[in-house]
């Protein structure tokens, strides 16, 4: 029996819907694009193109994995973020649209042709670092992560985006070994989910994503307690920081950064109107160490 693109998409949507998957239409299309080697446009403009037996087998494998709640990004090995396409796997946190709030705020603060240095703590797949560097050609950045497997993904992404000459990637423990007053910008999407909450999350997250990137300790604030004074240390006077937070952590995280000496501390909401990013500045009058 022949299977066309339109029939394959319809069957895939139905199969995912029956499996209780959210957004079955989008997931089915993304997996069909990769399995059949087509674009979204081709599915619409050439709907009666037939799939080969190999393509059908690949799509069926993808659908079985998705029905077991493996994330689509892990199945197809990629995820769009901001204006870039990133390679992803089980060793990195899947980029989320709410993290784009950090990129948006950074681009507002740093004009297009401005030269500046940035640090991304817990760089993962390179999500924030590479999205910013792709938009700011005069900028250079350093990404640090405790996971060597995550760094391998980030290096691949930097190379694929031709950003490896401006993005340095190092294995390390947050800011250990970094000099004071070194960066114009520090960003981070640290683990912020309370330990006991992780087991209540959807299977795509609790089973398939690295716990190191999720677990924020008993109250979800462990990373921020460590990061706040260190981010203020490595920032240049007048430098900006932006960190992602959980929806209910704004007050606590703002307080930690104020206690560390930050000024102009504020919280920005995401498109779902949840508190998402805490920003602030290192006192520009502070003398370099």
Swiss-Prot record:
Assigned EC number: 2.1.1.297
Claim: S-adenosyl-L-methionine is one of the keywords in the record: yes
Coiled-coil regions, chain positions: none
Gene3D superfamilies: DNA helicase RuvA subunit, C-terminal domain, Vaccinia Virus protein VP39
BP term (GO), one: methylation
SUPFAM superfamilies recorded: S-adenosyl-L-methionine-dependent methyltransferases
Heme found in the keyword field: no
Binding residue positions for S-adenosyl-L-methionine: 122-126, 145, 174, 189
Function field: Methylates the class 1 translation termination release factors RF1/PrfA and RF2/PrfB on the glutamine residue of the universally conserved GGQ motif.
Family: Belongs to the protein N5-glutamine methyltransferase family. PrmC subfamily.
Protein's recorded name: Release factor glutamine methyltransferase
Organism: Caulobacter vibrioides (strain ATCC 19089 / CIP 103742 / CB 15)
């Amino acid at each position: 029996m022949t299977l066309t693109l339109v029939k394959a998409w319809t069957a895939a949507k139905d199969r995912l819907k029956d499996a209780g998957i959210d957004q079955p239409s989008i997931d089915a299309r993304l997996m069909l694009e990769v399995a059949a080697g087509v674009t979204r446009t081709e599915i619409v403009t050439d709907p009666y193109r037939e799939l080969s037996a190999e393509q059908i087998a690949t799509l069926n494998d993808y659908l079985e994995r998705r029905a077991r709640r493996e994330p689509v990004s892990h199945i197809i090995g990629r995820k769009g973020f901001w204006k870039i396409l990133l390679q992803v796997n089980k060793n990195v946190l899947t980029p989320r649209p709410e993290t784009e709030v950090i990129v948006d705020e950074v681009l507002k603060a740093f004009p297009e042709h401005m030269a500046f240095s940035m640090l991304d703590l817990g760089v993962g797949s390179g999500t924030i670092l590479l999205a910013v560097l792709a938009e700011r050609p005069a900028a250079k950045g350093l990404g640090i992560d405790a996971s060597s497997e995550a760094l391998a993904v980030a290096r691949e992404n930097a190379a694929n985006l031709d950003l490896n000459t401006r993005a340095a990637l190092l294995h390390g423990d947050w800011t250990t070994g970094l000099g004071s007053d070194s960066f114009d910008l520090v960003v981070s999407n640290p683990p912020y989910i309370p330990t006991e909450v992780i087991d209540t999350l959807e299977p795509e997250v609790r089973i398939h994503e690295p716990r190191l990137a999720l677990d924020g300790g008993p109250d979800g604030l462990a990373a921020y307690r460590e990061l706040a004074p260190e981010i203020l240390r490595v920032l240049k006077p007048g430098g900006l920081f932006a960190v992602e937070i959980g929806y209910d952590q704004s007050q606590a995280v703002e307080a930690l950064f104020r206690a560390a000496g930050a000024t102009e501390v504020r919280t920005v909401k995401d498109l779902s109107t949840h508190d998402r990013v805490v920003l602030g500045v290192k006192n520009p009058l502070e003398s370099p160490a």
